[in-house]
């Protein structure tokens, strides 16, 4: 025991007693099939996750760069490398420091134009794989049916939610995650904890009034709460629906040595909720000893992770280069991060001036975005989010 600090031992055993994982350091690298034109060598991305004494956390890595630089392509190749038949290293190669594979892989993307890997595509059946998104993988080749309808989202949420609240460990983790998300005032107003608690007495009276079997009573309980939860969920904004759907599935499916891969989670969220989500994700990854890799345009996300966990992608044409930012990013000013990542001074270009002027006049990201009538590129949206976030937090 003398090789471990009192704090580390106390925290580890407390976490294990609560159903969490033993936190260990681990590392892995992804070797791309693409070459660095300047050296002729394969491009590499290195990842190192620290278990204990991990402040700021190193369990979230970010791939960031200008629009069109290839972030989404890279994470898709990562997924194919891990999940598909890759004997010839067509999609690249993962090398893990522990010599094994990830236990779970969770792929999160809410793009309507996504082309996700399905469970049928998974070559190594020992790996648990879960896709969370807006494509119904049962009909991925049928353009009429492939997109999940918004009226299907409540049931998608409820099925995972029901599994979570029926598990003591998962339910506790869910409550912790919601508490972190509630640091965003708009999320706190949802009062998610009351959705079920206010109706429990009504359910108890219903069940006491019946003489049905335990199985039938369980079905009554599930259907009773399904109606309540679906009704509450249906009232939410699209951003709140997506964040809840994401978090409840992460709580449900993330286990030790899980790799979570996410594509542009900021697309549906306003900046304060982006920050809260990243903190909740990091807490969950720490509890389960997992790691997340996020492809993003968002300086707000970069602000939540240290420099060593940010891979900046640069290049043009066939040329690609991966490097860490020159500045420390955790908690850094968003203007400094934007300048570092996108390579120009905030306010030095024409569209920046317009974005800043609109941000100064509006009191929410949604209102600022509406000002542009759908005519903003992804990069500009990220910068507008950063301006609004700075405004709301000063």
Specify the residue positions occupied by each region the protein language model found.
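Extended helical coiled-coil dimerization/tether regions that scaffold
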Residues: 1-54, 99, 112-119, 134-241, ...
